[in-house]
């Protein structure tokens, strides 16, 4: 699975003009299931995201996790994280997981974060969503579950 993680002061996702997920301080996580992801990819990625130390401590160093600060997580599915732009001008998405399994892994990721005690809001898989955020820092981190055993 791939994730683009943004430290936010606030974030919100809307579908057809209605807010379906909103958080205050915490993380906005755009997530994509990749073809061939193992069954435990969602849980492993969730554990890494929950412990990622990108919030400031008393010494103004990035040394605290979203769990440490009592923050929340907004999880939004985004298959375009699988974009292959190596050739041509139009990205390919063949490395993204098929929608049915992709949605299952996306939901497992959100549930795994909840199981770790985090408040989690979500977008709507496959919907045309509008995401607004205030990126705090800005801090934006790319994470791929395949990068770590």
From Swiss-Prot:
GO cellular component: cytoplasm
Gene Ontology biological process terms from the UniProt entry: D-amino acid catabolic process
Subcellular location(s) of the protein: Cytoplasm
InterPro entries from the UniProt entry: Daa-tRNA_deacyls_DTD, DTD-like_sf
Catalytic activity: glycyl-tRNA(Ala) + H2O = tRNA(Ala) + glycine + H(+); a D-aminoacyl-tRNA + H2O = a tRNA + a D-alpha-amino acid + H(+)
Motif Gly-cisPro motif, important for rejection of L-amino acids: where in chain: 137-138
HAMAP family: Deacylase_Dtd
Domain notes from UniProt: A Gly-cisPro motif from one monomer fits into the active site of the other monomer to allow specific chiral rejection of L-amino acids.
Function in brief: An aminoacyl-tRNA editing enzyme that deacylates mischarged D-aminoacyl-tRNAs. Also deacylates mischarged glycyl-tRNA(Ala), protecting cells against glycine mischarging by AlaRS. Acts via tRNA-based rather than protein-based catalysis; rejects L-amino acids rather than detecting D-amino acids in the active site. By recycling D-aminoacyl-tRNA to D-amino acids and free tRNA molecules, this enzyme counteracts the toxicity associated with the formation of D-aminoacyl-tRNA entities in vivo and helps enforce protein L-homochirality.
Subunit structure: Homodimer.
Name of this protein: D-aminoacyl-tRNA deacylase
Organism lineage: Bacteria, Pseudomonadati, Pseudomonadota, Alphaproteobacteria, Rhodobacterales
């Amino acid at each position: 699975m791939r994730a683009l993680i943004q430290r936010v002061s606030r974030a919100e996702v809307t579908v057809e003009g209605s807010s379906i997920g909103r958080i205050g301080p915490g993380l906005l996580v755009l997530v994509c299931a990749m073809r061939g992801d193992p069954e435990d990819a969602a849980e492993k990625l969730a554990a890494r995201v929950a412990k990622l130390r990108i919030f400031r401590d008393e010494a103004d160093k990035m040394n605290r996790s979203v769990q440490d600060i009592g923050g929340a997580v907004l999880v939004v599915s985004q298959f375009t994280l699988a974009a292959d732009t190596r050739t041509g001008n139009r990205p390919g998405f063949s490395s993204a997981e098929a929608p049915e399994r992709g949605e299952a892994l996306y939901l497992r990721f959100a549930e795994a974060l909840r199981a770790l005690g985090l408040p989690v809001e979500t977008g709507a898989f496959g919907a045309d969503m509008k995401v607004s955020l205030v990126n705090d820092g800005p801090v934006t981190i790319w994470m791929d579950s395949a990068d770590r055993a």
